[in-house]
Structures are given as structure tokens and as C-alpha cells.
UniProtKB/Swiss-Prot annotation:
Residues 1-73 are annotated as: RNA-binding and homodimerization. It comes from the Viruses. Pfam families: Flu_NS1 (PF00600). Residues 223-230 are annotated as: PABPN1-binding. HAMAP family: INFV_NS1. Inhibits post-transcriptional processing of cellular pre-mRNA, by binding and inhibiting two cellular proteins that are required for the 3'-end processing of cellular pre-mRNAs: the 30 kDa cleavage and polyadenylation specificity factor/CPSF4 and the poly(A)-binding protein 2/PABPN1. In turn, unprocessed 3' end pre-mRNAs accumulate in the host nucleus and are no longer exported to the cytoplasm. Cellular protein synthesis is thereby shut off very early after virus infection. Upon interferon induction, ISGylated via host HERC5; this results in the impairment of NS1 interaction with RNA targets due to its inability to form homodimers and to interact with host EIF2AK2/PKR. Keywords: Eukaryotic host gene expression shutoff by virus, Host cytoplasm, Host gene expression shutoff by virus, Host mRNA suppression by virus, Host nucleus, Host-virus interaction, Inhibition of host innate immune response by virus, Inhibition of host interferon signaling pathway by virus, Inhibition of host PKR by virus, Inhibition of host pre-mRNA processing by virus, Inhibition of host RIG-I by virus, Inhibition of host RLR pathway by virus, Interferon antiviral system evasion, RNA-binding, Ubl conjugation, Viral immunoevasion. The lineage of its organism: Viruses, Riboviria, Orthornavirae, Negarnaviricota, Polyploviricotina. This is Non-structural protein 1. It is found in: Host nucleus; Host cytoplasm. The dsRNA-binding region is required for suppression of RNA silencing. Belongs to the influenza A viruses NS1 family. InterPro entries: NS1, NS1A, NS1A_effect_dom-like_sf, uS15_NS1_RNA-bd_sf. The gene is NS. It comes from Influenza A virus (strain A/Anas acuta/Primorje/695/1976 H2N3).
């Protein structure tokens, strides 16, 4: 196993522990708490994949971080912070919408890279909007936290989420996953539109209805892809 992979996991575990202590003092805002919860799932998945104990890794990560801080001067820290581009966290959904449980009458699921696409194909003839919470850097989607499809009544009928055991995805990965979700939902004559935030940062091009133009052949192909890979 690559030593950098192990040490990266150890540092991530310790930094999560620090953030958890911060949250326990009721100091974190909603985006902070949301990332904390999702990063916990990611660490569990990575720990299982690597065969590493999280508690042991956290202690090792603490030693690594302490060593770095001992060697770090205040001036070097200022220069590092100044050179790192700042990302923004954008929210279409409330914390309640993100954490709400939902179920599917006719579940369909597809794994695309490090993203999991889920939808209820029992939903027909509905107006649906896609909403997401994600971070943006250089005016492009950086990391998808969660995307969900909502009916006008507020019911959740679809979802795109990162797989905890496979961290890392690009804006193109997210764009392709959204296309698959839209294709599957439109297969049952649902009308799907995308939130303005997603249009701006994930799609870059859309029609007047607020969704990307998908040719009928592409929609049918996407829907068949989901059915064949479940």
C-alpha cells in the first residue's frame, strides 16, 4: 500500500476529529455540519477499503499534523493561505431536505465512476426540479455534496451522491450523472428542470425550461443504461 495513501487517510481522520470537536461545541453552521456528516461516511468507506482502523489512524494523523505545525512559521502560513484559491459552498437545499429519508416504489440505481444515481421509476407525469448542494472554485463545480430530484409536492424521487469508498469526481462526471438522471425521469413523461445554481455551474448551457437539451435518442439510451445495469 502506498505510504502517501495511508498518511493522507491518517491526516484526514485527525482533521475530521478536530472538526467534530468544533461541532460538539455548537459552533458549526449548516454547511459545516453537512460536510462533517458526509466526510464521516467517506472516512468509514476509505478505512474499510484500506483495512485501517480509524481511531489508530486519527492518533497517527495527530502526530503528522503536530510535526507540520512545529515546523511552520507564521509567515509561511500566511503565504500558504494567500496562495490557495477559496472555494464557495452553494446550497439549493435546506438541511432538512438533504437529511430527509425517502424510499422508492420502483428503485433504479446506477454507479457512474464515484457517483451513485438513484431514482424511482414509478413516478410518472410529474414536474420535477433538480436541486443540489456543492462547492465551486474558479466558477466551476468543485465537489458535489448531494443532488436530489423533487416533485412540486416536495417528494424526493431521485438522487445523485458521491460514493464514500470512491472519493473524487469532476464537474464532467457530475454533468454526465445529471444527464442519466434526467433521461431516466423523462422516460416516464416527467418534465425535468434544473435549478438556476446548477445551470450556472454544472451545465453551462440549457434551454428556456431550465434544463439541458437532450435529444430523444440520448434520453432513451440513458434510461436503458440504467435498466440494464441495475
Amino acid at each position: 500500500m502506498d505510504s502517501n495513501t495511508v498518511s493522507s487517510f491518517q491526516v484526514d481522520c485527525f482533521l475530521w476529529h478536530v472538526r467534530k470537536r468544533f461541532a460538539d461545541q455548537e459552533l458549526g453552521d449548516a454547511p459545516f455540519l453537512d460536510r462533517l456528516r458526509r466526510d464521516q461516511k467517506s472516512l468509514r468507506g476509505r478505512g474499510s477499503t484500506l483495512g485501517l482502523d480509524i481511531e489508530t489512524a486519527t492518533r497517527a494523523g495527530k502526530q503528522i499534523v503536530e510535526r507540520i505545525l512545529e515546523e511552520e512559521s507564521d509567515e509561511a502560513l500566511k503565504m500558504t493561505i494567500a496562495s490557495v484559491p477559496a472555494s464557495r459552498y452553494l446550497t439549493d437545499m435546506t438541511l432538512e431536505e438533504m437529511s430527509r429519508d425517502w424510499f422508492m416504489l420502483m428503485p433504479k440505481q446506477k454507479v457512474a465512476g464515484s457517483l451513485c444515481i438513484r431514482m424511482d421509476q414509478a413516478i410518472m407525469d410529474k414536474n420535477i426540479i433538480l436541486k443540489a448542494n456543492f462547492s465551486v472554485i474558479f466558477d466551476r463545480l468543485e465537489t458535489l455534496i448531494l443532488l436530489r430530484a423533487f416533485t412540486e409536492e416536495g417528494a424526493i424521487v431521485g438522487e445523485i451522491s458521491p460514493l464514500p469508498s470512491l472519493p473524487g469526481h469532476t464537474d464532467e462526471d457530475v454533468k454526465n450523472a445529471i444527464g442519466v438522471l434526467i433521461g431516466g425521469l423523462e422516460w416516464n413523461d416527467n418534465t425535468v428542470r434544473v435549478s438556476e445554481t446548477l445551470q450556472r455551474f454544472a451545465w453551462r448551457s440549457s434551454n428556456e425550461d431550465g434544463r439541458p437539451p437532450l435529444p430523444p435518442k440520448q434520453k432513451r439510451k440513458m434510461a436503458r443504461t440504467i435498466e440494464s445495469e441495475v
